[in-house]
Amino acid sequence: MMDNDNQFWKRFLIFTILMFLFITAYELFYIYYVKPSQPQKTEKKEVVKKEEFKNVNLPQLMLGTFREKQEYKNTKTVKLGIYSLELSEKGGKILRFIDQKYGFDLISKAERELKIFPLEIFTGNPDLDQKLNFGEYEIKEGKNSVELIHKELKVKKILSYKNGAIHLSVEGLKPPFWVFVGSPPDDEAFYTHVGPVLKINGEVVRLDVDDLKGINEFEGNIEFGGEESRYFFKGAKDYQKHIVYKVKLGDKFVSLSTFLYDGEKTIYLGAKDYARLRELGLVDTLDWGTLKIIVKPLFLFLYWIYEHTGSWVLSILVLTFIVRIFLFPLGYKSVVSMQKLQELAPKMEKIKQKYKDDPVKMQEEMMKLYAETGFNPMAGCLPILLQIPIFFALYKVLIITVDLKVSSFLWIPSLADKDPYYILPVIMGLTMILQQKMTPSPDPKQALVGYITSVAFTLLFINFPAGLVLYWTLNNVFNIIQNYLIKEVLLKDKSKGGSKKK
């Protein structure tokens, strides 16, 4: 029966690794294969007349040779709050849009290759659209604002900065018309959604470009819509029609989003910085994933800690500590169960040797031993299983926290990137081995499985963002301290108390 218990713990360790891989795979499946429900149309008060709204022509983006041959030489760099924009006189185009806090350019490689840029205007009239998007503009800079004035048509695009966003108003051109948002920002996905995202009729819809048709229309109460990546979002707020184009670019497809302009709009091209998103009502652009019910509260709690500490490293430390305190009762039961298993090991070995030719009798004797000693083999497994959703939720929280991109730790320049010297993953692996040493298995084979697991996790985490590796390392350290306190303090005090009573 000793073999049965060893097999149980082997299976549990394998199960833990498989659970990690399963949740990761499920996240990817959810992102790329689960079809979102089609949003229902709702009525909303119109800024323009309903008839005009319905009769507006679909935008023709004029992609192709003519556009790709255009050159934009006369440019001007302007500052709008926390953003830096490079604007061209030809077409009044935004050639660069840099979020200065994160040093990130929101203009994607796809947009540069196609030579189509955010906030281009499309009326459905090809001649007018060509003049609007390729004519000459005067660039007039103001205080936290810039005016792009078409020299021939006298159409004026006014971009003004307020509360972390750009407010777009257009003069000299009667709405409704279409405004181009862009394609997804060039950001590493890392198990998060990249592509079109809308909050329409109260439901957040994330779309996979491979599932789209050539032209995809959405109509309803659209709170926000646009294109997203792991850390960045580009889109608009509060409108009623949205179109996503699926365009072939090289050997893959890319999505391009436009929205129907019916009056001044709030445009956001920037990081998914929670402080900004909260101010703008864009918090749901954060990709909470399938464990949203746990991830969102943990994220908000982590951010609350950060607001009071001012350090993301300290915030991760405090959050990990608090979670360990919360899970202490489960950890206590697990350690007690493991210690009980070690105490029973000699008796279990005797039963194994005595009934090695009679598995049924061996099973009966083992169950009798469990009943006499009050040992439950599942008692060590269940507490750990209950912790898994919380650990994976914390993992997701750290994946979507853009602030880690500009947070450093000792030799690591950014907690959002991997450790360039691989020191932290090695430390993490050593803490896992130390945990194995503190709770040794009575079976050498089982101990070997534990060490192999430690090495496997080290290799798995070696290219993970340093913030995740830091969290897992701190979690291991707190677990080591917890096990020490339980074994060397609580259980010894308990046994001393029992001896005194005798």
From Swiss-Prot:
<dbReference type="GO" id="GO:0032977">
    <property type="term" value="F:membrane insertase activity"/>
</dbReference>
<comment type="function">
    <text>Required for the insertion and/or proper folding and/or complex formation of integral membrane proteins into the membrane. Involved in integration of membrane proteins that insert both dependently and independently of the Sec translocase complex, as well as at least some lipoproteins. Aids folding of multispanning membrane proteins.</text>
</comment>
<comment type="subunit">
    <text>Interacts with the Sec translocase complex via SecD. Specifically interacts with transmembrane segments of nascent integral membrane proteins during membrane integration.</text>
</comment>
<keyword id="KW-0812">Transmembrane</keyword>
<keyword id="KW-1133">Transmembrane helix</keyword>
<dbReference type="InterPro" id="IPR047196">
    <property type="entry name" value="YidC_ALB_C"/>
</dbReference>
<feature type="transmembrane region" description="Helical">
    <location>
        <begin position="382"/>
        <end position="402"/>
    </location>
</feature>
<feature type="transmembrane region" description="Helical">
    <location>
        <begin position="12"/>
        <end position="32"/>
    </location>
</feature>
<keyword id="KW-0813">Transport</keyword>
<protein>
    <recommendedName>
        <fullName>Membrane protein insertase YidC</fullName>
    </recommendedName>
</protein>
<feature type="transmembrane region" description="Helical">
    <location>
        <begin position="452"/>
        <end position="472"/>
    </location>
</feature>
<comment type="similarity">
    <text>Belongs to the OXA1/ALB3/YidC family. Type 1 subfamily.</text>
</comment>
<feature type="transmembrane region" description="Helical">
    <location>
        <begin position="409"/>
        <end position="429"/>
    </location>
</feature>
<dbReference type="Pfam" id="PF02096">
    <property type="entry name" value="60KD_IMP"/>
</dbReference>
<keyword id="KW-0472">Membrane</keyword>
<feature type="transmembrane region" description="Helical">
    <location>
        <begin position="312"/>
        <end position="332"/>
    </location>
</feature>
<keyword id="KW-0143">Chaperone</keyword>
<dbReference type="GO" id="GO:0005886">
    <property type="term" value="C:plasma membrane"/>
</dbReference>
<keyword id="KW-1003">Cell membrane</keyword>
<dbReference type="InterPro" id="IPR028055">
    <property type="entry name" value="YidC/Oxa/ALB_C"/>
</dbReference>
<dbReference type="GO" id="GO:0051205">
    <property type="term" value="P:protein insertion into membrane"/>
</dbReference>
<dbReference type="InterPro" id="IPR001708">
    <property type="entry name" value="YidC/ALB3/OXA1/COX18"/>
</dbReference>
<dbReference type="InterPro" id="IPR019998">
    <property type="entry name" value="Membr_insert_YidC"/>
</dbReference>
<keyword id="KW-0653">Protein transport</keyword>
<dbReference type="InterPro" id="IPR028053">
    <property type="entry name" value="Membr_insert_YidC_N"/>
</dbReference>
<feature type="transmembrane region" description="Helical">
    <location>
        <begin position="286"/>
        <end position="306"/>
    </location>
</feature>
<dbReference type="GO" id="GO:0015031">
    <property type="term" value="P:protein transport"/>
</dbReference>
